[in-house]
Amino acid sequence: MATSSSAWLMFSDHYPEILIAIACFLIFSLLLSARSSSKDSLPYNWPIFGMLPAIISNNQFNDFTTARLRKMGWTFIFKGPWLLDMDYIFTCDPSNINHMFNDNFENYPKGELGKVFDIFGNNIFNADGDLWHDHRKMAQTILWDGNYRTMQATFIRNKMDNALIPILDSAACKRKPVDLQDVLLRFTFDTSCFSVLAADPESLTMEFPPVPFSKAADQALDAALTRHITPRLIWKLKRFFNVGSERTLAVAWKVIDSYIYDKIAELKAKRKLVGKINSYDAVSFYMDNFNIHDDKFLRDNAFTYLLAQRNTQSLTMTWLFYALFENPKVELKILSELKSIVDESSERKFNDGFALFDSNMIQSAIYLHATLCEALRIYPPVPFEIKDAHKADVLPSGHKVRAGEKILFSPYAMARMKGIWGDDCLEFKPERWITGNGTLKHEPAYKFFAFSAGPRICLGKELSFTQMKMVVATIIYNFHLQMVKGHVVEQSNSILMDMKHGLMVQVRKRSVM
């Protein structure tokens, strides 16, 4: 026995690379086994590793989760590695979502998950209890203010006139493909900066300049996703030693803070120089209406508003156009509706032969609104969310929840369940949102979760619809877009459902006036 032990030690001393190769082979075999298992079966629960190898080996998390939820009746238990507190309940059951966001709302606060998104600071996104109520009341006052909405609508129209249309027109004239996702991200970044900070960064220009803030924000969200799938102790150690994704987050955080604090300082300096100005941006609103001048408070809320507007709107519109490429009959119906609106409108606005749709003109665009709803259903900009249980609970599905246990729910998967949306759930079908009387059909928020549900439902829902309809209508009426042949559309593995390779399109001017 001693001889064989000595031989093993000698072997390991002289041939460490062979041991490394053996270890790599075993790990590779584990991942291969996880990857080759039936796509509809529950992930194999390995000793020590749990079900994590199945996640690591899969590059399409949303589709992976959807297949398992479909097989397991909309809810299953995900077992993480031993001793690392990474067990989850995965669900797309509307009754469970209604329970967490409505019936037992107080038991599912932001809690510990707020620490994962600490870059947002102490604001409406991370707050709980009375502090959250206070933030929400202030946000409601801002977002529902008539002057704020008018200012935004005017700026969006001007941005379409002076930036969006010229760029698409140039692409059409030069027959040069453009990345529509990038165009829309820049557009919504400019509009959100103006509505929040009274500043136009002019990121959407012919030169397509670098946008350090946007890059940093994307890196910060990626780091947050890494925290979600990493044991808490590990990512906190990485943060302490400033390595890996935590180092990337720290650098991105500085870029974000520098940009927002600079804009707040500029706005305050302008106000000090000329006195109170009639500006209805969010930061000015906090200072004028609530007498809040603390830079940290303003920074935290500004960052939340910026990301909420920039990311969700741009990604929704990007996926909508992709859906139109796959369903050209839907685009023709939208175009027909827009022609009728333009013909009947007394507020027809043209510039250099291009039609501009304002907030009043698109109110009657029922089919366009339904198409946006369908895009949000099938391609939710936030494909999954995570909740922590404050106390032990039992979900309507019958699954027991331990205090502190995490629940991942998937609006993306919900949209793909026949038992929830019908046998045609995989079809892009705006008609499902229109009643027999031609009005918009309402679906409960816990089923159509694009704007959250319950007390935390998005306050800017209708404002967001109005703004997106203005942009989409203006693009569709004036231009015909086609996806570049051979372009691959693939979801990123991210907290947000952006396109990994963008959306490359060819642009052609329409002749519809």
From Swiss-Prot:
Cytochrome P450 that catalyzes an intramolecular para-para' C-C phenol coupling of 4'-O-methylnorbelladine in alkaloids biosynthesis, including haemanthamine- and crinamine-type alkaloids, promising anticancer agents. Catalyzes the formation of (10bR,4aS)-noroxomaritidine and (10bS,4aR)-noroxomaritidine from 4'-O-methylnorbelladine. Belongs to the cytochrome P450 family. It comes from Narcissus pseudonarcissus. It is a single-pass membrane protein. Heme binds at residue 458. It catalyses: 4'-O-methylnorbelladine + reduced [NADPH--hemoprotein reductase] + O2 = (10bR,4aS)-noroxomaritidine + oxidized [NADPH--hemoprotein reductase] + 2 H2O + H(+); 4'-O-methylnorbelladine + reduced [NADPH--hemoprotein reductase] + O2 = (10bS,4aR)-noroxomaritidine + oxidized [NADPH--hemoprotein reductase] + 2 H2O + H(+). Pathway: Alkaloid biosynthesis. Its cofactor is heme. Keywords: Alkaloid metabolism, Heme, Iron, Membrane, Metal-binding, Monooxygenase, Oxidoreductase, Transmembrane, Transmembrane helix. This is Noroxomaritidine synthase 2. The chain crosses the membrane at residues 14-34. It holds the Pfam family p450. Gene3D superfamilies: Cytochrome P450 (1.10.630.10). GO terms for biological process: alkaloid metabolic process; lipid metabolic process. One of its GO terms (cellular component) is membrane. Mostly expressed in stems, and, to a lower extent, in bulbs, roots, leaves and flowers. One of its GO terms (molecular function) is heme binding. Its EC number is 1.14.19.50. It is found in: Membrane. CDD domains: CYP86A.
